[in-house]
Amino acid sequence: MDKLREKINAARAETDEAVARAEAAEAKLKEVELQLSLKEQEYESLSRKSEAAESQLEELEEETKQLRLKADNEDIQKTEAEQLSRKVELLEEELETNDKLLRETTEKMRQTDVKAEHFERRVQSLERERDDMEQKLEEMTDKYTKVKAELDEVHQALEDL
């Protein structure tokens, strides 16, 4: 009977550990999902910046063309063209930087997705393990109840003798 109690207590301890691990995995999953959400927001922001920079670059390139055609004075034309060329260079550099950040963020999002999937599988595994342990605990409790009832009957029969 003591062994049965020890087994039940051990099963309860295992169940408690499984529940704790499942809760920890769920917390980690929530954290990873939050990180994923933040990375998605960052990705969207960088995408908008990249699109804006591309649009601005196209506008400046068009403006550069128009200024070159309209300018009568070579000195003025040269100065304005240099300024616009410099702006174009800066925008191209900014576009390259944004593209790099976009690629990095995309890779980080992919890695975060992989982590989230891993933790989801781990949570499911721990939940199945917990369910199995709970079922075993119920079975052992039923066995304990039956054995105790039989023991009480035997004890009662012995007392009646």
Curated annotation (Swiss-Prot):
Q: Residue spans with biased composition (Basic and acidic residues)?
A: 40-52
Q: Which UniProt keywords apply?
A: Coiled coil, Cytoplasm, Cytoskeleton, Repeat
Q: In its keyword annotation, does this UniProt entry include Lipid metabolism? A: no
Q: Where is this region: Disordered?
A: 40-65, 107-134
Annotated GO MF terms = actin filament binding; actin lateral binding
**Listed SUPFAM superfamilies:** Tropomyosin
The record's subcellular locations are: Cytoplasm, Cytoskeleton
Look up the record and give one Gene Ontology term from the biological process aspect: actin filament organization
Which superkingdom does the taxonomy of this entry point to?
Answer: Eukaryota
Gene Ontology CC terms = actin cortical patch; actin filament; actomyosin contractile ring; cell division site; cytoplasm; formin-nucleated actin cable; mating projection actin fusion focus; mating projection tip
Q: Which residues form a coiled coil?
A: 1-161
Q: Quote the InterPro entries the UniProt record gives.
A: Tropomyosin
Short name of one Pfam family: Tropomyosin
Query: Would the keyword Metal-binding be found if you checked this record's keyword annotation?
Result: no
* Annotated function: Forms part of the F-actin contractile ring during cytokinesis.
Q: How does it assemble?
A: Homodimer.
Instruction: Give the comment on domains.
Output: The molecule is in a coiled coil structure that is formed by 2 polypeptide chains. The sequence exhibits a prominent seven-residues periodicity.
Q: Can you name this protein?
A: Tropomyosin
Question: Which species expresses this protein natively?
Answer: Schizosaccharomyces pombe (strain 972 / ATCC 24843) (Fission yeast)
| Lineage of the organism | Eukaryota, Fungi, Dikarya, Ascomycota, Taphrinomycotina
